[in-house]
């Protein structure tokens, strides 16, 4: 359970600020386009004067956007395909839950726990600090907390 006050703060303040700051950085270099996922997949292509701003704020936007997309008022079970991939990667859904919980609860300071598809097409649990996104490490996030 996450209370309404926390969700409002994250949506109306944090996420809105990440969007505004990412847009301000992108305005300085319109030639690079606005595809944050592509830019953050190869951060070296981002001009040095806005690189950290896009890593922080673009990452914050992408992370929160996925988080909002995944929220549901009702408990949802994974699809059969995802459940099979979880069982293959972790041995059981319970083992996945333990790994995901550990990633979320052992992160010092702010950050995220992720279920990602790695470059080998396999599921893994990772944690990132602050607003870093696993996209920058070549991973595709499918669950975020």
UniProtKB/Swiss-Prot annotation:
Keywords: Iron, Manganese, Metal-binding, Oxidoreductase. This is Superoxide dismutase [Mn/Fe]. One of its GO terms (cellular component) is cytoplasm. Its cofactor is Mn(2+); Fe(3+). One of its GO terms (molecular function) is metal ion binding. Fe(3+) binds at residues 10, 64. It comes from Streptococcus salivarius. Pfam families: Sod_Fe_C (PF02777), Sod_Fe_N (PF00081). It catalyses: 2 superoxide + 2 H(+) = H2O2 + O2. The keyword Manganese applies. InterPro entries: Mn/Fe_SOD, Mn/Fe_SOD_C, Mn/Fe_SOD_N, Mn/Fe_SOD_N_sf, SOD_C_sf. Mn(2+) binds at residues 10, 64.
């Amino acid at each position: 359970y996450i209370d309404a006050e926390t969700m409002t703060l994250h949506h109306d303040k944090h996420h809105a600020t990440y969007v505004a700051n990412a847009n301000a950085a992108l305005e300085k270099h319109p030639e690079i386009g606005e595809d944050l996922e592509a830019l953050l997949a190869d951060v070296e292509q981002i001009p040095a004067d806005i690189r950290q701003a896009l890593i922080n704020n673009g990452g914050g936007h992408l992370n929160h956007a996925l988080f909002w997309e995944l929220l549901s008022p009702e408990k949802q079970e994974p699809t059969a395909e995802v459940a099979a991939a979880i069982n293959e990667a972790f041995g059981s859904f319970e083992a996945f839950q333990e790994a995901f919980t550990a990633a979320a609860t052992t992160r010092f300071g702010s950050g995220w726990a992720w279920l990602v598809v790695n470059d080998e097409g396999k599921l893994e649990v990772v944690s990132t600090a602050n607003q870093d996104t696993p996209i920058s490490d070549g991973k595709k996030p499918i669950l975020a907390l």
